[in-house]
Amino acid sequence: MLFKQAILVATTLTDLAVATPVVDVRRRTDPASSCSTGTLNCCNSSGTVEDKTIAGLLGILNIVVSDITALVGITCTPITVVGAGGTSCTSQTLCCDNNNFSGLITLGCIPININL
């Protein structure tokens, strides 16, 4: 199953030219109810770089991370207006640094306790 997902991601992103960025993201300390230093995102899942799925995606995209302890968001979409009609996040709401790789991977995230 994981292999199929990796192949799907690889074939979907064939036209995406990604340089090899080195990202230095340390543990964020924002309060769990605010997002003043990043963007508010609705992500399908999140985890650490030690997670095999996330490590595989980082490898496919040639994203090199150094000293990352914050969460990594997977398949995230920005939430632009909090409380607007129709805005909802049924997955995980995360506040992430502006290290977004086409919405597939977003680095430097912390969970946010917010009702949308």
Swiss-Prot record:
Which UniProt keyword terms apply here?
A: Cell wall, Disulfide bond, Glycoprotein, Secreted, Signal
Q: Which domain of life is it from?
A: Eukaryota
> What does the induction field say?
Expression is increased by carbon source limitation.
Q: List the disulfide bonds.
A: 35-95, 42-89, 43-76, 96-109
Q: Where is the protein situated, by its record's location annotation?
A: Secreted; Secreted, Cell wall
**GO cellular component annotations of the record:** extracellular region; fungal-type cell wall
Q: Signal peptide span per the entry?
A: 1-19
Q: What Pfam families does the record point to?
A: Hydrophobin (PF01185)
What GO MF terms are annotated?
Answer: structural constituent of cell wall
Q: Which residues are glycosylated?
A: 44, 100
Subunit text: Self-assembles to form functional amyloid fibrils called rodlets. Self-assembly into fibrillar rodlets occurs spontaneously at hydrophobic:hydrophilic interfaces and the rodlets further associate laterally to form amphipathic monolayers.
Sum up the protein's function in the record's words.
Aerial growth, conidiation, and dispersal of filamentous fungi in the environment rely upon a capability of their secreting small amphipathic proteins called hydrophobins (HPBs) with low sequence identity. Class I can self-assemble into an outermost layer of rodlet bundles on aerial cell surfaces, conferring cellular hydrophobicity that supports fungal growth, development and dispersal; whereas Class II form highly ordered films at water-air interfaces through intermolecular interactions but contribute nothing to the rodlet structure.
Spell out the family assignment given in the record's similarity comment. Belongs to the fungal hydrophobin family.
Protein name per the record: Class I hydrophobin 1
Q: Which organism is it from?
A: Pleurotus ostreatus
